[in-house]
Amino acid sequence: SGAFIGSSYTFATARDWARFGQLYLQDGEWNGERILPEGWVAYTRTLTPHGVANLGYGAQFWLNTGGENRRWPNLPEDLYAMNGHQGQHVFIAPSHDAVIVRVGLSEFDNWRMSDFAADVLAALPAPAAGAGP
């Protein structure tokens, strides 16, 4: 409350962004201690009341909802992400127990974070049956 801009101007290292993503992947717990309120991560992963599924926006996170029309069709439907200015991304994929961070400026049109993330997820061991939320 009282925040002029709640969506921007957060500066951190790639490692700190990865930790932040890991905190969300772990449902708001860190080293056995609850940091975020119970249910907060589920709330952030819920489509906003007037949201359109394939535009997929939750509470400050982009969602990969909408079935075949989802934002990143080549990525898991449970994936959610923070996308920042000039190519800053934190992708969280619960079904793969993975956080993917990219910080950097992309000045060429053919860079696609979703393709990069799909390649990273494909290189990881297959998710265990029943993995994810």
Predicted feature locations:
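Short, conserved, surface-exposed binding loops centered on an aromatic residue
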Residues: 9-13, 33, 51-53
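Sec/Tat-exported extracytoplasmic proteins
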Residues: 21-28, 48, 65, 103, ...
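Structured C-terminal helix/loop/strand segments within mature extracytoplasmic catalytic/sensor domains
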Residues: 79-133
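Structural helix-adjacent loops and short alpha-helical linkers that scaffold large soluble proteins
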Residues: 28-37, 111
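Active-site-proximal alpha-helical segments within enzyme catalytic domains
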Residues: 8-29, 88-104
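Active-site helix/loop module of the DD-peptidase/beta-lactamase fold
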Residues: 1-7, 12, 39
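Non-transmembrane alpha-helical segments in soluble domains
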Residues: 18-25, 41, 45, 62, ...
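Active-site Gly/Thr loop motif
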Residues: 45-99
